[in-house]
Amino acid sequence: MIMAAEEVFWRNPKYHAFAQAIRTIPLRERDVKEAEERLRRFAPYIAKVFPETQPAHGIIESPLVRIPNMQRRLEKMFQTNIEGDLLLKCDSHLPISGSIKARGGIYEVLKHAEDLALANGMIAIGEDYAVMASEEFRQFFSRYSLVVGSTGNLGLSIGIIGAQLGFRVTVHMSADAKQWKKDLLRSKGVTVIEHLTDYNKVVEEARRQSAEDPTSYFIDDENSIHLFLGYAVAAFRLKKQLEDMNITVDETHPLFVYLPCGVGGGPGGVTFGLKLVYGDHVHCFFAEPTHSPCMLLGLMTGEHDRVSVQDFGLDNKTEADGLAVGRPSRLVGNMLENVISGVYTVDDSTLYRLLAAMVETEEIYLEPSALAGVAGPVRLFRDSAGQTYVEENDLKEKMKNAVHICWATGGSMVPKGVMEAYYREGMRIETMTGNCFSEGR
């Protein structure tokens, strides 16, 4: 079924209790807390140069919202009862770059900036980092360059923050990157190099170019611990959001989180953070396009980055540009092979249908890749492998108290015309399936 690019749900047979799984992971909670502390140090700078972050005092965070109308629509569309509450984590609306990549990407650039500033005696820990907005600092950072390979959103986050600090930034974009993302980066003074190859080849080329320049810093989407830790911080923020909403996560109130997955750094970091916070009470599932199930194949075979989707006859072509990755992260696969609960795949047509449904029911606009997570609760309840997971983990009687969080990874930066075209495509597909939304909300 995978090789036929059909939707599948796979439960991970290597999934273990977290106390056991963490023994083979070289990171601990203190590493995530250190990343959180660094982001706090930079908050005055962020608030100064990105006014949209001032209400949150320079902390880059997204809303967590209940989506009951969408929950009912999903039940109707797929003839499936979803037990528990459905929520959306709106990283699609993160300030600065409008995607989950604003977490890891911005964090790694800030860490590099801090390292350079400290090493050159420009600043000391404890001082006000808002001073980095000065021309003196911009001149200093302009002596250095940043290089990254991206399908789109990581390039956006690194390009925007890097250019703001004063770095010379080069973003290598794969063939599937959307034109508007390239245009936006160029408008910020970022050098965009377009490639005709797919994501993994682009990263290889970006890495090679960066290695030739001693002032260059390469942000390695496939293997970066710093990106991973930037994403992991999200879990501690989410814990507070759930508490503020009076939502309990414990033995009898399980939490299910559905995360769109490209190379794996974003969902991997978030999963690690969530496991540190909630242990075995949280269950994390990755969502991939049917044509680009790289993490699924890496985990299933145990070969991780040694296999690609092309090895299995798949073309890695999907409208979910952020997830169009043919080979998974070795770092994430190795670290989390006993931590990820499972992986499911979603067809592009399903993504478009869900995109239109989210607009219709909740008036929330997401890009296609962000909808991969929204399919999760349906798949858990509808697919036999999902139900086997529930039964094997003694969750059946607890599902009525379950909390389901779909992680919306991007969307708010999409130009209006492009978003309208996405919506029309979703409505067109929905009409063809004979499931039109005309019954109202």
From Swiss-Prot:
Cofactor: pyridoxal 5'-phosphate
Matching InterPro entries: D_Ser_am_lyase, Ser/Thr_Dehydratase, Ser/Thr_deHydtase_PyrdxlP-BS, TrpB-like_PALP, TrpB-like_PALP_sf
Enzyme Commission identifier(s): 4.3.1.18
SUPFAM superfamilies, alphabetized: Tryptophan synthase beta subunit-like PLP-dependent enzymes
Domain of life where this protein originates: Bacteria
GO molecular function, a single term: pyridoxal phosphate binding
PROSITE patterns: DEHYDRATASE_SER_THR
SS bond partners: none
PANTHER family the UniProt entry points to: D-SERINE DEHYDRATASE (PTHR48078:SF9), THREONINE DEHYDRATASE, MITOCHONDRIAL-RELATED (PTHR48078)
UniProt cross-references to HAMAP family, sorted A to Z: D_Ser_dehydrat
NCBIfam families xref list: D_Ser_am_lyase, PRK02991.1
Name assigned to this protein: Probable D-serine dehydratase
Organism: Geobacillus kaustophilus (strain HTA426)
Source species taxonomy: Bacteria, Bacillati, Bacillota, Bacilli, Bacillales
